[in-house]
Curated annotation (Swiss-Prot):
<comment type="similarity">
    <text>Belongs to the GOLPH3/VPS74 family.</text>
</comment>
<comment type="subunit">
    <text>Homooligomer.</text>
</comment>
<dbReference type="GO" id="GO:0005802">
    <property type="term" value="C:trans-Golgi network"/>
</dbReference>
<dbReference type="GO" id="GO:0031985">
    <property type="term" value="C:Golgi cisterna"/>
</dbReference>
<dbReference type="GO" id="GO:0070273">
    <property type="term" value="F:phosphatidylinositol-4-phosphate binding"/>
</dbReference>
<keyword id="KW-0446">Lipid-binding</keyword>
<keyword id="KW-0472">Membrane</keyword>
<protein>
    <recommendedName>
        <fullName>Golgi phosphoprotein 3-like</fullName>
    </recommendedName>
</protein>
<feature type="binding site">
    <location>
        <position position="71"/>
    </location>
    <ligand>
        <name>a 1,2-diacyl-sn-glycero-3-phospho-(1D-myo-inositol 4-phosphate)</name>
    </ligand>
</feature>
<dbReference type="GO" id="GO:0007030">
    <property type="term" value="P:Golgi organization"/>
</dbReference>
<dbReference type="Pfam" id="PF05719">
    <property type="entry name" value="GPP34"/>
</dbReference>
<feature type="compositionally biased region" description="Basic and acidic residues">
    <location>
        <begin position="10"/>
        <end position="30"/>
    </location>
</feature>
<feature type="region of interest" description="Beta-hairpin required for oligomerization">
    <location>
        <begin position="171"/>
        <end position="182"/>
    </location>
</feature>
<feature type="binding site">
    <location>
        <position position="155"/>
    </location>
    <ligand>
        <name>a 1,2-diacyl-sn-glycero-3-phospho-(1D-myo-inositol 4-phosphate)</name>
    </ligand>
</feature>
<dbReference type="GO" id="GO:0050714">
    <property type="term" value="P:positive regulation of protein secretion"/>
</dbReference>
<feature type="region of interest" description="Disordered">
    <location>
        <begin position="1"/>
        <end position="30"/>
    </location>
</feature>
<dbReference type="InterPro" id="IPR038261">
    <property type="entry name" value="GPP34-like_sf"/>
</dbReference>
Amino acid sequence: MTTLTRRGRRADVGQENRVDSEDYIKDKDEEESADSKDIRLTLMEEVLLLGLKDKEGYTSFWNDCISSGLRGGILIELFLRNRVVLEPSTLRKKRLTDRKVLLKSDTPTGDVLLDETLKHMKATEPAETVQSWIELLTGETWNPFKLQYQLRNVRERIAKNLVEKGILTTEKQNFLLFDMTTHPVSNTTEKQRLVKKLQESLLEKWVNDPHRMDRRTLALLVLAHSSDVLENAFSSLSDEKYDMAMTRSKELLDLDPDTEGNKPNTCEMIWAVLSAFNKS
């Protein structure tokens, strides 16, 4: 599990799964960007973009968190698009990590990774928890019969989506013994917009209440932290603003997910994913 660090590190479903629950949160502005001129990115694309080295076009070789972070992004994205919900809270299942992910709709989203995950969920009986799905989609399971749920070549597939959207380009680089496909950032404006959004959410537009934050921004903060790429968004800040952003993000991410996830009109999947990563 990743931990927030100080300035010193800156350098470097079956039928039973289908539900018609009233407990899902209606998607207000998640489907449409608040600024229509911005390129529409999924949470997974935003996380990968934050993690990519601009010129080199690849993520840090030392980052072993981003794979599971991207899978968490898939679950939140499906929730925000009203494709899945968490089963209702009961006396026996009050904790977010105990509640199963239920399929609400298997209508295709148009995103290959999301739709592939929907097919897995539709074919899975009994339903699985958020933590189980992150492990299954990452391939971290000892059960050979469940290896079929692993999503393969996720980073490369997300990168290709970003290439198609004109944000990345594709190059071949030689690393002594092998050649590697890399994806340098070609549209720096889009990445700067993404970084600015995260910075402003913790500085100029700080609301000191996660339930008043834009849901996609809150989700990105959680996923970027879990993927160990959040600090990348703060590297351009002055020392004072950097410390303030890190302090506020730590306060936010240290909140109890079960408490926050059970508050009215909350996006419980975001807190469920955070809780799953806190346990891992």
